[in-house]
Amino acid sequence: MAMPLKWEFPGGKIKPGETPEHCLCREIAEELAIKVAVHHALAEKTHAYPEFTITLYPFVCTIISGTIILREHAAVIWLPREELASLDWADADRPVLEAYLQFAGQETP
């Protein structure tokens, strides 16, 4: 899904027989050339855009190896938690951000 000029979390489509966790690890390796460890699942979020509906399966992860190389994205940014809400997020990703900030003990503005 491409949302020009909007920030999105990395990820992609789940393949048949693949778990959401495995999908995320595979997609991050493909898109960013890094390996992550999945630590905590957040509640799935479904959003209806005018053209399609998407369900996101968010996870809290850490990078365990590699250096980020952008293979499919135009930009990447690493911010402190308290600055994440200042970005212009895609509509489907905003509830994921809110869930993450609640998990991390932050309030969203």
Model-found features: residue ranges?
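Short histidine/acidic/glycine/proline-rich micro-motifs that form metal-
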Residues: 14-15, 47-48, 83-85
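Short secondary-structure junctions
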Residues: 31-38
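Nudix hydrolase/Nudix homology domain
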Residues: 69-109
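Conserved Nudix-box catalytic region and its N-terminal flanking loop in Nudix hydrolases
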Residues: 1-30
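Active-site-adjacent beta-strand/loop module that shapes the phosphate/pyrophosphate-binding cleft
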Residues: 35, 44-67, 77, 100
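Hydrophobic packing within well-folded, soluble alpha/beta domains
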Residues: 20, 24-29, 41, 59, ...
